[in-house]
Amino acid sequence: GKDSMYVDGNLQGRYGETHKVSALETLQFSTISLIDDVTRCVTMDSKVAGDLVYVLGTTRNELGASEYYAHLGYLGRNVPEVRPDEFAPSYRHLMHAIENGLVASAHGIYRGGLAVHLAMVAMGGNLGLEADLTQVPGGGKMRDDVLLFSESAGRFIVTIDPDKREAFEDIF
C-alpha cells in the first residue's frame, strides 16, 4: 500500500463526463519491528477444535459511527475512544504470552465488532466456536447487540490450548 494524506480518483459520470472525487485527508501510520523468532508469530485463524476462546480488553457501549449503527441508519454519539495507558499493559501481556508459546491465534477486534471478528477467526480455521457473552470483559449489564457490535478499541480475540490455560491466565 501507500502512505498518503491524499486519496483522489476520477469517476466516470452517467454521460461520459469525469468527476474528481477526493477522500477526506487522513493521517496514516506504518510501523515496523524486529521479530526475534518468527516461529513464535501467530495468525488470526483458530487452530484446533476445543481450544479456549478469550476476549482481551474492555468492551464499552461505543456503537457511535459503527458498522452496526450504519446498517440501522443511526449515527450515534458514543464513538470508540483510544486509551493508550489502558491498552499498553494488555498488549505487553499478550506479547509475553505469544513469546512463551501460549497463544494459538490472536486477532484484533475493530470494524464490525466482536461478532464479525469471532466469525473471521472461526472461518479462518474452518471451525465453529462457542462464546459466552457473560464472560466478555465490560459486558456486565450491556445488551447482547452492544457486546457483539461495539467497536471499542484495544481488544483481541485469543485462542489457546486448554492445557495452557493456567499459564496464560497467570500472565493476565
Where are these regions (language model features)?
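Gly/Pro-rich turn-and-neighbor structural signature
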Residues: G1-D3
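Mobile "lid/hinge" segments at catalytic clefts and subdomain interfaces of large enzymes
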Residues: Y15, V21-E86, M95-I98, S152-A153, ...
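Glycine-/charge-enriched secondary-structure boundary and capping motifs
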Residues: Y6-D8, Q12-Q28, L75-G76, A97-F172
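Phosphate-sensing "switch" segment of ASCE/P-loop ATPases
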Residues: Y91
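Hydrophobic alpha-helical segments and helix-packing faces
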Residues: R83, F87, R111-L114
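Residue-level detector of flexible, active-site-proximal loop/helix-junction positions
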Residues: M5-Y6, D36, R60, G138
